[in-house]
């Protein structure tokens, strides 16, 4: 067990890593393309020509924005640092793998939360009322951590090619968007679709967004949504740590 002083020291190191990631990767090509442009155009392709309420649209856009932005930073970091050999210096530093990964997650979380403010502000501008702001904020922060940890799993592949990791992550992320209630409410899906939706963490964030906006019914109880995101976060973080511990020697 680590003492309080050691935990604080590791947290400071994680924050230093996050600061480095923010400076280097926020304007990285794959992050901008897969984190901002792709979900933006995907959303426009869905909504143009359809008569949908602004509350429904903003809730779906917000969920998709947090999902894509938070899963776009962490997959880029490990392969890029493998290619540039920066990972060797990091591995030689007095820092644990868990701390290094947590630093990457923090950078991704900040990015996801910052970009998520855009659809929120757009919604408020167009008359959307946020009836449960605390629940919405909690859901966004928890989901940003969850999706960032999910991105770490993609980056555990021992490769220096960012394109390989982003291709794999895209193959997972796109199907999740279409089964998670972003475009079609979970309650309108067939029984097998609802079963699949329950396996996606994005479903629970979208459900919280629907609950937080005026006149939109959510499919699951709020407590279930929050608990599900927390459970997915723990599973993703534990799996990512184990996978990176195994793949690190192959990167050096």
What are these regions (language model features)?
Residues 2-38:
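Aromatic- and glycine-rich beta-strand/loop motifs that create alpha-glucan
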Residues 9-17, 182-224:
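Short hydrophobic, aromatic-rich alpha-helical segments embedded in or entering the lipid bilayer
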Residues 24-71, 170-177, 230-236:
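Hydrophobic alpha-helical transmembrane segments of multi-pass membrane transport/permease proteins
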Residues 39, 44-47, 130-131, 207-252:
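Alpha-helical transmembrane segments of multi-pass membrane transporters/translocases
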Residues 46-48, 157-199:
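Transmembrane helix segments
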Residues 48-80, 138-156, 182, 188, ...:
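Hydrophobic alpha-helical transmembrane segments of membrane proteins
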Residues 55-123, 170, 177:
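Hydrophobic alpha-helical transmembrane segments of multi-pass membrane transport proteins
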Residues 97-98, 102-169, 219-230, 234-241:
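Alpha-helical transmembrane segments and their short interhelical loops
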């Amino acid at each position: 067990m680590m003492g309080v002083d050691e935990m604080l020291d590791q947290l400071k190191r994680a924050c230093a890593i996050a600061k480095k990631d923010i400076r280097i990767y926020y304007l990285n090509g794959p992050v901008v393309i897969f984190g901002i442009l792709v979900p933006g155009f995907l959303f426009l392709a869905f909504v143009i020509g359809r008569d949908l309420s602004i509350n429904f649209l903003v809730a779906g856009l917000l969920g998709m924005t947090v999902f894509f932005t938070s899963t776009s930073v962490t997959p880029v970091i490990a392969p890029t640092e493998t290619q540039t050999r920066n990972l060797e210096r990091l591995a030689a530093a007095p820092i644990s793998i868990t701390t290094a990964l947590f630093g990457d997650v923090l950078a991704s979380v900040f990015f996801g939360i910052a970009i998520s403010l855009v659809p929120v502000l757009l919604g408020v501008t167009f008359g959307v009322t946020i009836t449960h702001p605390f629940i919405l904020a909690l859901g966004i922060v928890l989901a940003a951590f969850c999706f960032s940890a999910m991105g770490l799993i993609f980056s555990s592949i021992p490769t220096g090619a960012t394109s390989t990791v982003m291709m794999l992550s895209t193959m997972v992320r796109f199907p999740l968007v279409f089964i998670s209630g972003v475009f079609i409410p979970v309650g309108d899906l067939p029984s097998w679709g609802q079963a699949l939706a329950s396996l996606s963490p994005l479903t629970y964030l979208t459900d919280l967004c629907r609950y937080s906006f005026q006149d939109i019914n959510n499919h699951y109880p709020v407590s279930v949504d929050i608990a599900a995101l927390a459970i997915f976060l723990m599973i993703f973080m534990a799996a990512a740590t184990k996978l990176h511990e195994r793949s690190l020697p192959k990167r050096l």
